[in-house]
């Protein structure tokens, strides 16, 4: 049999391919290695390229408990990972972020968050699969708070979430606003009663301050609040407002996620004894964390939930750490949690 002559160029190319395959296999094996002890920030950082944590001053040091569950004061938001990007009129963007966040990219996001001391992801039951895969295959320990937005309703969403490892659950904000607008206080009472049977802290989420007031008025008090707070002085904040056509009273455009300015929220929450997780503090990208985080913490937020791409986590953790290192300037509301 006549052998094919192999050129020097073919030989070098083949060798390079083998080296690349070998390197990829070694990298994959290293990334999937399972530590036998509970992973802390420094332990997880050993499994990340140094560049991923470049610029990190130190991991989060501020933690507090809600109902016995210890949370970092900065929580990773999961809207972007699930494809709910809130990008105004850029309708293509939801599909773009879903394509970006393939499972391996989600794992990377979680690994960086944990290495930076962010120990919790807050998201929808739709992400239960990838979260469980991360725990199972990557050895991750990140905690999961579920918004219970589920095809069978929020109570079934709470049950499914806890069965899949959720440490805490809360009444989805959009659904809560709609029920409050309709005066359906019994929906909150039923959710709180049924979800508390699951043995985890139970919250109520909302975008409207009126929803918080409605729940308080009807003695539907959760273990914690999920309440939006952000600036409303940006150019698109009031575009397309037509509250009469919106079931939740917020208008139909994806431009704004509150019904009042920040100060009104801060003033009301000042007297509430329940822990408050603030979300949408950046207004879905209209303000930098350097401006928004200190305002939210100083205004009374006990925790901030913020969507962060993998390349944003280090900077956002540094901003949060700087606030706590500076002596909690201007905060008057007692810390809860």
Question: For each of these PLM feature ranges, what is it?
Answer:
Residues 205-293:
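Catalytic alpha/beta core domains of metabolic enzymes, predominantly
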Residues 131-139, 158-165, 219, 270, ...:
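Acidic (Asp/Glu)-rich catalytic clusters
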Residues 76, 202, 276:
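Conserved, mostly hydrophobic/aromatic
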Residues 127-134, 154, 177-190, 263, ...:
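Active-site-adjacent beta->alpha loops and helix N-cap segments on the catalytic face
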Residues 2-19:
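N-terminal secretory signal peptides and thylakoid transit peptides that target proteins
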Residues 313-333:
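C-terminal helical cap(s) of enzyme catalytic domains, especially alpha/beta-barrels
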């Amino acid at each position: 049999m006549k052998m094919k002559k192999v050129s020097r160029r073919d030989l070098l190319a083949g060798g390079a391919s083998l080296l690349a395959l070998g390197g990829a296999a070694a990298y994959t094996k290293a990334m999937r290695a399972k530590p036998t002890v509970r992973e802390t920030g420094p332990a997880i950082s050993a499994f990340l390229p140094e560049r991923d944590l470049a610029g990190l001053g130190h991991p989060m040091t501020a933690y507090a408990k809600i109902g016995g569950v210890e949370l970092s004061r900065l929580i990773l938001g999961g809207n972007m990972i699930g494809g709910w990007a809130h990008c105004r009129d850029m309708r293509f963007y939801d599909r773009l972020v879903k394509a970006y966040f393939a499972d391996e990219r989600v794992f990377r996001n979680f690994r960086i968050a944990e290495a930076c001391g962010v120990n919790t992801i807050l998201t929808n039951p739709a992400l239960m699969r990838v979260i469980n895969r991360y725990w199972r295959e990557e050895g991750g320990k990140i905690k999961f708070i579920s918004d219970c937005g589920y095809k069978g309703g929020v109570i079934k969403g709470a049950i499914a979430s806890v069965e899949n490892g959720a440490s805490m659950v809360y009444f989805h904000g959009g659904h809560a606003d709609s029920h409050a607008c309709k005066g359906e206080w019994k929906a909150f009472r039923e959710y709180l009663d049924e979800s508390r049977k699951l043995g985890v802290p139970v919250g109520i989420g909302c975008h409207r301050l009126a929803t918080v007031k409605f729940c308080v008025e009807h003695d539907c008090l959760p273990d914690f609040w999920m309440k939006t707070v952000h600036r409303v002085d940006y150019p698109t904040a009031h575009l397309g407002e037509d509250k009469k056509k919106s079931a939740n009273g917020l208008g139909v455009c994806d431009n704004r996620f509150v019904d009042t300015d920040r100060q009104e929220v801060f003033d009301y929450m000042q007297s509430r004894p329940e822990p408050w997780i603030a979300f949408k503090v950046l207004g879905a990208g209209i303000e930098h964390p350097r401006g928004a985080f200190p305002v939210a913490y100083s205004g009374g937020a006990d925790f901030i939930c913020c969507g962060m791409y993998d390349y944003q986590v280090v900077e956002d953790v540094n901003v949060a750490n700087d606030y706590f290192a500076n002596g909690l300037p201007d905060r008057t509301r007692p810390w809860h949690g």
